[in-house]
Amino acid sequence: MKEKIHPEYKEAKVVCACGETFVTRSTKPVIKVDICSKCHPFYTGKQKIVDTEGRVEKFMKKYSKK
């Protein structure tokens, strides 16, 4: 393998919007995510609408019956 062409692969801290943190490996030191396994509806068993940048409101406004 050639030297000095591969990225540095080290431990990275993953931070979720819910506050959960865990360590994995990556080329970046910190990774910020919106949903993790602690708060994702599939893993928690709770129904929850995940709204990113008001997409649900935009859809409801556009297609709601008046």
From Swiss-Prot:
Cofactors demanded by this protein: Zn(2+)
Pfam families hit by this protein: Ribosomal_L31 (PF01197)
One of the record's GO cellular component terms: ribosome
UniProtKB keywords: Metal-binding, Ribonucleoprotein, Ribosomal protein, RNA-binding, rRNA-binding, Zinc
GO molecular function terms noted in the UniProt entry: metal ion binding; rRNA binding; structural constituent of ribosome
Signal peptide interval: none
Coiled-coil annotated spans: none
Keyword match Metal-binding: yes
GO process annotations (BP): translation
Textual note on the cofactor: Binds 1 zinc ion per subunit.
Chain residues that bind Zn(2+): C16, C18, C36, C39
Gene3D superfamilies according to UniProt: Ribosomal protein L31 (4.10.830.30)
InterPro entries associated with the record: Ribosomal_bL28/bL31-like_sf, Ribosomal_bL31, Ribosomal_bL31_A, Ribosomal_bL31_sf
Quaternary structure and interacting proteins, as annotated: Part of the 50S ribosomal subunit.
Described function: Binds the 23S rRNA.
Family: Belongs to the bacterial ribosomal protein bL31 family. Type A subfamily.
The protein, known as: Large ribosomal subunit protein bL31
Organism this protein belongs to: Thermodesulfovibrio yellowstonii (strain ATCC 51303 / DSM 11347 / YP87)
Record lineage: Bacteria, Pseudomonadati, Nitrospirota, Thermodesulfovibrionia, Thermodesulfovibrionales
